[in-house]
Design a protein with these regions (language model features):
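Extracytoplasmic gate region of multi-pass secondary transporters
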Residues: 40-44, 223-276, 280, 363
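Helix-to-loop junctions at the C-terminal end of transmembrane segments
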Residues: 72-85, 275-286, 371-372
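Interfacial helix-cap and linker-helix signal at transmembrane-aqueous boundaries
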Residues: 47-48, 80-81, 164-173, 250-251, ...
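Central cavity-lining transmembrane alpha-helices of secondary-active solute carriers
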Residues: 63-78, 265-277
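Intracellular juxtamembrane helix-capping segments at the cytosolic ends
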Residues: 126-140, 327-340
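Structural signature of the two symmetry-related core transmembrane helices
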Residues: 88-102, 289-303
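Helix-loop-helix hairpin linking two adjacent transmembrane segments in secondary transporters
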Residues: 151, 155-199
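Hydrophobic core of transmembrane alpha-helices in multi-pass small-molecule transporters
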Residues: 30, 100, 112-127, 233, ...
Length: 406
């Protein structure tokens, strides 16, 4: 009887800890990705108007930050997470992201602009998707897809709220103060929860963390690693390009600040449904097939930005693109965990996220350059459609994983 009671108590504590982990990762992604990553593009047109910067220059901050930070700190962050756990790295990441947004609110020179975008990239690497993915994968064996889907709802929830909050703050206090306020909110939302994360040694609920990790050399010589990496770069590059330019595109169509904010909010609201749906599908069907579906949804949405206008066109785009966006970021760590194991997930995703970060930073710059040259987005959007379809084709060569019962 004492043994039975001890087992029941252990299971109850494990469930409570799992709930805390899901809430913490939800709020971290809500703040660092939803608020910070999706909030910054809302201010691009203000920067362009006040400082006279081109669209290529404005989107180059994200590119420079991730290209400088990603290749070095992405690998180091993955190794540190696997070795010491995510907590300390996440605390540093939250503080750096808050500093970045506050700094960008008064960065009136390109030097300061790039400096604080480096802080932005450091915060994203240390406190964003990578440690959250590892936390979820370490604490969950069964229902990992659902847990990842719930945690990733934080991105959609934060991203849906931030344009509305930013628009309201900007109207009353100006864009400088509203961007600084978002930086303060990021710290207040995420830091307290991250502070109380238990050490990785307590994550005994997932038996996979006791298995020996696959050597990194074996991962780097595995063709599936490159298929997953290149395929994800295609999809992340496409959604990154569209996201960074969506408000600028809407302003070209003479949407007001409020109308543009509501469209962006609809994209992120739709991503909530996408994350739940794709997380549920990922626990039922082969995850490769779910990944292909997501990439095809993204490829289907972008043409709506090219066709002649008709009633509801932008709103239909926002819903379809949002569903694809919701599943895109979430499915990659699930596939990586299936292919290479949870113990090596930090290092594996550290490398893949670096590659994805390169794509996510260069594609918006490319799209901005296409617009600066041709004065429209037509050619750039056509290329993005082709890249999304190429990603679906590449992913189709991955093995089947993740089906219930296998």
């Amino acid at each position: 009887m004492p043994i039975l009671m001890e087992e029941l108590s252990s299971k109850s504590n494990s469930r409570s800890s799992q709930t805390y982990i899901v809430i913490t990762t939800f709020l971290s992604l809500f703040a660092l990705v939803g608020f910070a990553f999706y909030g910054l593009p809302f201010f691009f047109d203000f920067m362009a108007r006040e400082y006279g910067w081109s669209r290529t220059v404005i989107t180059s901050g994200n590119a420079l930050g991730k290209l400088l930070v990603g290749p070095l700190f992405g690998f180091i962050a993955g190794w540190l997470i696997d070795k010491y756990g995510p907590r300390r790295l996440m605390m540093a990441g939250v503080l750096m992201m808050g500093t970045a947004l506050i700094g960008l609110s008064f960065a009136d020179s390109l030097g300061l602009f790039y400096l604080f975008y480096i802080f932005n990239a450091l915060g994203y690497v240390c406190g964003g998707p990578l440690p959250c993915q590892v936390l979820i994968s370490r604490w969950f064996d069964k229902n990992r897809g659902k847990a990842m889907g719930i945690a990733y709802l934080g991105i959609g929830a934060g991203g849906a709220l931030v344009p509305l909050i930013a628009a309201g703050l900007e109207k009353n206090y100006g864009w400088h103060n509203s961007l600084a306020a978002l930086g303060v909110m990021v710290v207040l939302i995420a830091f307290p929860m991250v502070w109380f994360i238990k050490g990785s040694s307590s994550a005994r609920s997932n038996p996979e963390i006791r298995e020996p990790a696959i050597p990194i050399r074996s991962i780097l010589t595995n063709r599936n690693f490159y298929l997953l990496g290149i395929g994800s770069m295609c999809a992340i590059g496409v959604v990154g390009g569209v996201n960074q330019h969506l408000k600028l595109y809407l302003r070209d169509l003479d949407f007001t600040q409020s109308q543009a904010a509501h469209i962006i909010s609809l994209v992120l609201l739709s991503s909530l449904a996408g994350r739940l749906l794709m997380g549920w599908l990922a626990d039922i069907f082969h995850r490769k097939h779910v990944m292909i579906l997501i990439y095809l949804i993204v490829a289907t949405a972008v043409p709506l930005l090219l066709v002649n206008d008709f009633p509801g066109r932008i709103y239909i785009f926002a819903v379809i693109f949002g569903i694809g966006l919701g599943g895109d970021y979430m499915i990659i760590p699930l596939m990586a965990g299936d292919l290479f194991g949870v113990r090596a997930l930090g290092r594996t995703m550290g490398i893949i996220l670096v590659a994805d970060g390169v794509a996510e930073s260069l594609f918006p710059m490319f799209l901005g350059a296409m617009h600066d040259i041709h004065k429209n987005y037509t050619l750039g959007f056509v290329i993005l459609i082709c890249v999304a379809l190429a990603g679906a084709l590449i992913v189709s060569f991955l093995p089947k994983t993740g089906k219930a019962g296998n």
